[in-house]
């Protein structure tokens, strides 16, 4: 007696592929901060704390140049300097990472596994041509600093 041929076994292979993009964002950074005048150091300054949220532990952060929105004219022969500073909280201490100025940005490699809490600050001061600190002129001051994650 002849039996019909048995069915052939078959196999098939499927490949699953995907990608996870590197992400980086800032959480808790306000749109604006008040600056306070410090008479002892003759500086006007403000700061804000924020967290860096990223799926990459080693990344670069750029602190853009300090953009002047408004400031009074400096006293004759003086210059008004402005600085942006980025600090990272590591083991309960604020460690300065990078500084920018009116004319140049700054960028730095950071390891957020050491701490994801950061502080952005802006300061200004006035000095004469010899570098001696002078009183800053009265008036309204406003600066903008942009920070960017460089992945």
Describe the role of every protein-language-model region.
Residues 2-80, 106-151:
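N-terminal small/polar-rich segments of proteins
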Residues 76-92:
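Short, surface-exposed beta-strand/strand-loop-strand elements in extracellular ectodomains
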Residues 91-113:
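Extended, solvent-exposed segments with strong compositional bias
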């Amino acid at each position: 007696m002849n039996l019909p041929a048995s069915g052939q076994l078959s196999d098939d292979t499927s490949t699953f592929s995907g990608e996870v993009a590197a992400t980086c964002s800032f959480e808790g950074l306000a749109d604006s901060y008040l600056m306070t005048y410090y008479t002892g150091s003759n500086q006007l300054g403000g700061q804000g704390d924020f967290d860096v949220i990223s799926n990459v532990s080693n990344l670069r952060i750029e602190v853009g140049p300090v953009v002047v929105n408004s400031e009074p004219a400096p006293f004759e022969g003086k210059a008004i300097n402005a600085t942006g500073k980025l600090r990272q909280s590591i083991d309960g201490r604020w460690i300065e990472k990078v500084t920018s100025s009116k004319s140049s940005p700054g960028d730095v490699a950071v390891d957020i596994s050491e701490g994801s809490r950061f502080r952005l600050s802006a300061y200004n001061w006035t000095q004469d041509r010899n570098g001696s600190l002078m009183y800053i002129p009265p008036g309204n001051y406003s600066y903008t600093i942009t920070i960017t994650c460089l992945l």
